[in-house]
Amino acid sequence: MGVQCNSKLLLLAVLITIILSSILVQAIPHKQKTSYQQLLLQSEHVQIPITVAEGDTICFNVSDNPCNFSSYWNHNNCELCGWTPFYSEYAGYSENKSCHPRFTCLHDTKGLKLHNVTTNDSGIYTRNVYYCDIPCNISDDHKHNVEDFDNCNTTINRTHYIITVSSSRYSKRTNSHVATHVGWTATVVIIICVLTYVNVTTTLKHRLRTRNNVNHTM
């Protein structure tokens, strides 16, 4: 009876371990699942999902554009940054501080930096690059008088950065949840080891007692 009881307890412990392990796998934070940046190429459009924690700083560094390219950063129908190639130095550069996120336009690389992001800053940040049908060697006299900006209508590249900002409170709660499951799983594993040891020891004693009884009867 003792051997059968220990075997049942061992099977029960194994079953509990399997259940806890399945729960633990499902409790892995969403942030860990999406920490990698998966590129989804759709012709000239690129989508880059990024997940960060609240309070982080995000920096999008991109290479400079040729002289006959123009580029713009947009978020929620608001143009954050813009560079027009026909103007000299900063004359063709625009930065709209009335837009919602705290950001800085990186003039040297035509990039974008988001500061101390919050959950409200989650969304799509799009960088549009256009080819302009205007020669690069336009004279200085005409650089400030270019009116045919409509010639910059050929889209070369459009990159959508899909930003998800997770709450720090959510991250702490999730990490605590995972740590709890890890602790329970470790405890069950220890219990299984103890039960296995007890089961093997009891079985050996039972066999030895049976053998001794047989020897005595003979």
UniProtKB/Swiss-Prot annotation:
Leader sequence residues: 1-27
Keywords per UniProt: Late protein, Membrane, Signal, Transmembrane, Transmembrane helix, Viral envelope protein, Virion
Q: Which residues cross the membrane?
A: 178-198
Q: Show the InterPro entries listed in the entry.
A: Ig-like_dom_sf, Ig-like_fold
**Disulfide partners:** none
Report the membrane topology from the UniProt record: Single-pass membrane protein
Q: Where in the cell is it found?
A: Virion membrane
Q: What top-level branch of life does the organism fall under?
A: Viruses
- Cellular component, GO, one term: viral envelope
Q: Which family does it belong to?
A: Belongs to the RL11 family.
> What protein name is recorded for this chain?
Glycoprotein UL1
Species of origin reads: Human cytomegalovirus (strain Merlin)
